[in-house]
Amino acid sequence: MISTIETDSKVRVRTWLKILKTSNFIEKYLRERLRNDHRTTLPRFDVMSALQRSPNGLKMSELSGVLKVSNGNITGIIDRLVQEGHVERIAIQGDRRAYLAALTDKGSKKFQEYALEHEMWINELLSDISSDDAKMITSLLSSITEKGDLK
């Protein structure tokens, strides 16, 4: 009985290591493609993605919460995106210190270009996984992340 438990435990540890290795590989691949093909970064892509999903804009604190990073990290990225004309700062009435960040039309078009290629790269990487298998993997991984939501 103990050997089965030990074996199951070791299989789960190896599974976790494989998930981690795969995630790191995909992230590195995406970072390189964005840098080489578009001279941009994955964090900038992530910020633009969050803003694309919020057409009325987001406060820095909201953006930090969505991306799970510090306000300081977000502020530097937003500053550069504003300089490039991809993001605009919108004043919040009644709060002189806070503002919303929103994609400009130029930024939205640029993000759509990035997103189209991003999806293509992911599809290339995962091409050996059927749609049904991808759904099953997603379900299994969701069962793990839902445990974190209980806290």
Question: Predicted segment positions?
Answer:
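Charged, amphipathic alpha-helical coiled-coil/dimerization segments
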Residues: I2-S3, D79-T138
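Short, locally clustered residues in the helix-turn-helix/winged-helix DNA-binding domain
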Residues: L20, N24, S49-P55, A115, ...
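Short amphipathic alpha-helical segments with heptad-repeat character
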Residues: W16, L20, N24, K68, ...
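C-terminal regulatory/oligomerization modules of transcriptional regulators
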Residues: M1-D8, D132-K151
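N-terminal positioning helix adjacent to the helix-turn-helix/winged-helix DNA-binding module
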Residues: T15, P43-R44, K106, D133
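N-terminal helix-turn-helix DNA-binding core of bacterial DNA-binding proteins
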Residues: K28-S70
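N-terminal leader segment of winged-helix/HTH proteins
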Residues: M1-H38
